[in-house]
């Protein structure tokens, strides 16, 4: 890159802040040191709240080494940053820290959170939701990885719930020799549903996927090679699957 281009980046540099996630059980951090290095290399200033990366195994020293500045408080991060990058949506405690014109880049999931929507409107924040960012081909590159994780984790959680010690029926998803495996129904054949099916079928469960698209079901048949069954999603088929299944996973966006 030419010196002229480097200068142009610095002229439009931004102050980017990464506060520590405070939603219960959330251990992730929005930027890794690699991401910080990329932003700093383009002339941006990155402010990271102290210990923001600890839950992900990243130390303050790791961030400092690539050019970030560490803030002792979340208030400073929110106050000094033109753009805030988070993992999860802001919670009520964070609403007062948002200010007019500030860019908030994170998962927002506004459809299920009217109070947050109202707070963003009242604070006049520029909210960019990860889950709505689209590629040129209509794909959702920031939502897809989370859907992959959710799909696989749903099977893991289902196995846990099926254990007798957790109030379940005492079933092993894969079964054992002489005992049939559990029947798993997955409603929705998108990214999350496919990943759930991969794990459940790989463990030996009998898997059925329901979807409303015939083209999607043909695609599922192609990738699973008869390892799962597919059904058109209808009220009757859903009722039948619910009555026969030990584990049902909802995977509809």
Where are these regions (language model features)?
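Short, Lys/Arg-enriched N-terminal segments with co-localized hydrophobic residues
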Residues: 3-13
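Short, hinge-like loop/turn segments at secondary-structure boundaries
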Residues: 63-67, 144-148, 225-229
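Glycine-rich phosphate/diphosphate-binding loop of Rossmann-like nucleotide-binding domains
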Residues: 19-58, 167-253
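Glycine/serine-rich phosphate-binding loop and adjoining beta1-alpha1 elements at the start
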Residues: 15, 21, 90-183
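Short gly/ser/thr-rich secondary-structure transition/capping motifs
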Residues: 65-71, 86-88, 164-170, 228-234
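Residue-level detector of structured alpha->beta connecting loops
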Residues: 81-82, 124, 225, 246
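Short beta->alpha connector loops at strand-helix junctions that form conserved
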Residues: 49-50, 73-74, 107-109, 129-134, ...
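An N-terminal-biased, well-structured beta-alpha scaffold segment characteristic
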Residues: 12-13, 18-119, 123
């Amino acid at each position: 890159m030419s010196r002229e281009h480097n200068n142009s980046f610095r002229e439009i540099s931004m102050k980017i802040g990464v506060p520590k996630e405070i939603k219960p059980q959330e251990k992730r951090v929005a930027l890794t040191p690699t991401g910080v290095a990329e932003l700093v290399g383009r002339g941006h200033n990155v402010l990271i709240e102290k210990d923001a990366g600890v839950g992900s195994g990243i130390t303050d020293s790791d961030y400092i080494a690539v050019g970030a500045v560490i803030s002792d408080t979340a208030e400073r991060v929110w106050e000094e940053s033109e753009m805030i990058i988070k993992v999860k949506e802001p919670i009520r405690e964070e609403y007062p820290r948002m200010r007019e014109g500030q860019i908030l880049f994170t998962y927002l999931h506004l459809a299920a959170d009217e109070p947050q929507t109202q707070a963003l409107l009242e604070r006049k924040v520029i909210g960019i939701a990860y889950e709505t960012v689209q590629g040129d081909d209509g794909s959702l590159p920031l939502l897809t990885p989370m859907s992959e994780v959710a799909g696989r984790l749903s099977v893991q959680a289902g196995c846990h719930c099926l254990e007798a010690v957790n109030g379940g029926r005492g079933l092993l998803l894969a079964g054992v020799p002489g005992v049939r495996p559990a029947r798993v129904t997955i409603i929705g054949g998108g990214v999350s549903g496919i990943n759930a099916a991969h794990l459940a079928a790989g463990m030996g469960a009998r898997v059925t996927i329901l979807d409303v698209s015939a083209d999607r079901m043909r695609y599922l048949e192609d990738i699973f090679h008869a390892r799962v069954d597919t059904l058109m999603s209808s009220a009757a088929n859903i009722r039948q699957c619910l009555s026969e299944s030990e584990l049902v996973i909802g995977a509809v966006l």
